[in-house]
Design a protein with these regions (language model features):
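ATP-dependent phospho-/nucleotidyl transfer catalytic cores
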Residues: 1-70, 74-190
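Conserved lysine of the Walker
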Residues: 202
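Conserved substrate/cofactor phosphate-moiety recognition/catalytic segment
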Residues: 210-270, 308, 312, 316-317
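The conserved Walker
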Residues: 197-198
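Small-molecule kinase domains that catalyze NTP-dependent phosphoryl transfer to phosphate-bearing small molecules
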Residues: 316-343
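Hydrophobic anchor at the beta1->P-loop junction of P-loop NTPases
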Residues: 192-194, 220
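Conserved phosphate-donor/acceptor-positioning beta-strand/loop module used by diverse small-molecule
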Residues: 294-315
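Hydrophobic positions on the alpha1 helix immediately C-terminal to the Walker A/P-loop
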Residues: 205, 209
Length: 343
């Protein structure tokens, strides 16, 4: 997990790839692509080296799976379960947990599902709160694509291969190299915020921005609870905890935390959608100012539904206990009374 080791392994991918095709040389444009990717990897590492060291010192290096692509994940008893982790090489196994997550995310993209790649990355960040790692995510995505490209190249050099098998492995290699270059580029940063009371469909509706626009989502319900030491699904057990989470001061702190995270993600070059009610104009103005400061486009996405439908959704959500939101019918009525409409 040492940054120097991670960097060496990343550069070794390029050296090994160039050597694997000595009997069937790469074309000039393919060699140029490798050169561009190696240069990008070196330059990105220089920018990220300090963050890599910080994560090493802060305990983000763990005994991980090490080979977490989709062929090594199965749905078992209703749960997604990884198997066949790397045991023969500690350097491949003791890694930043983000590297493991990036491997799976990359493989979604490799299978043609960039939408699932972004959904997984956004959900991973939402669950872990590891937003400081976002500047590293793209570097690890590219690294993992190159690892799979190298593995395909190694398979292509094994003896007694049929001509068809050689072509398949070579194509797989070059497709992963092409994906690596694609992953060096992100969607243009921009900022969306939602507007709507509880139950109006904000969380469901913003999935489209994640999958189609590549946005990373920040959810106020989740970040509010994280800020005050609660699990997302944990309900306040008494009036004291209710006040701790939902007082005027707590709401102000929650929006300030969302603003801090949104600014950080935008500066990392990522599009961001903030899923919160934004019923008060002052909070909408706060985020519009962030977009202006970061010089990115800003848009408010409104959500609404009939009151009867809002009530039905809230009752069903509380019955299932399936969401971080603690909204009740009383909260809904308060929101409808205090909502400041868009102008």
């Amino acid at each position: 997990g040492d940054p120097e080791v991670v960097f060496r392994e990343a550069i070794d991918n390029f050296t090994d790839l160039r050597g694997q095709f000595s009997s069937s040389p790469l074309e000039s444009n393919q060699l140029e692509q490798l050169d561009r990717l190696e240069l990008w990897t070196r330059q990105a590492y220089q920018r990220l080296e300090e963050l890599l060291k910080q994560r090493h010192d802060q305990g983000f290096i763990r005994e991980c799976h090490g080979d977490l692509h989709l062929n090594n994940v199965v749905r078992l008893d209703g749960k997604w379960t990884p198997f066949d982790g790397i045991e023969f090489n500690e350097e491949f196994r003791w890694i930043d947990i983000l590297s493991d997550a990036a491997f799976l995310a990359m493989d979604f993209a490799a299978q043609g599902h960039l939408d699932l790649e972004r959904s997984f990355v956004s959900a991973y960040l939402e669950q872990t709160g590891d937003y400081q790692a976002v500047p590293l995510m793209r570097w690890y995505l590219v690294y993992r694509a190159m690892v799979r490209g190298k593995v395909a190249a190694i398979r292509s050099s094994q003896p007694n291969q049929t001509a068809q098998a050689l072509r398949t492995e070579r194509r797989d290699c070059l497709e992963h190299v092409g994906l690596a270059e694609q992953l060096t580029k992100s969607e243009a940063p921009r900022l969306w915020i939602t507007h709507g009371v509880s139950g109006s469909g904000k969380t469901t509706g913003t999935e489209g921005l994640i999958q189609q626009q590549g946005a990373l989502r920040l959810r106020s319900d989740v970040e509010r609870k994280r800020l005050f030491g609660f699990r997302p699904s944990q309900r306040p057990k008494d009036e004291a905890q209710q006040q701790q989470l939902y007082s005027y001061s707590a709401t102000q702190q929650t929006y300030e935390r969302l603003a801090e995270l949104a600014s950080m993600l935008l500066r990392s070059g990522e599009p961001v959608v903030v899923d919160a009610t934004f019923l008060q104009r002052r909070f909408r103005d706060m985020f519009q100012a962030i977009a202006a400061q970061e010089n990115v486009p800003f848009r408010i996405v409104p959500f609404s539904a009939d009151v009867s439908e809002l009530e039905r959704r809230i009752v069903e959500r509380r019955r299932q206990h399936s969401d971080a939101s603690d909204a009740t019918l009383e909260v809904l009525r308060q929101q409808l009374d205090s909502l400041e409409p868009l102008t």
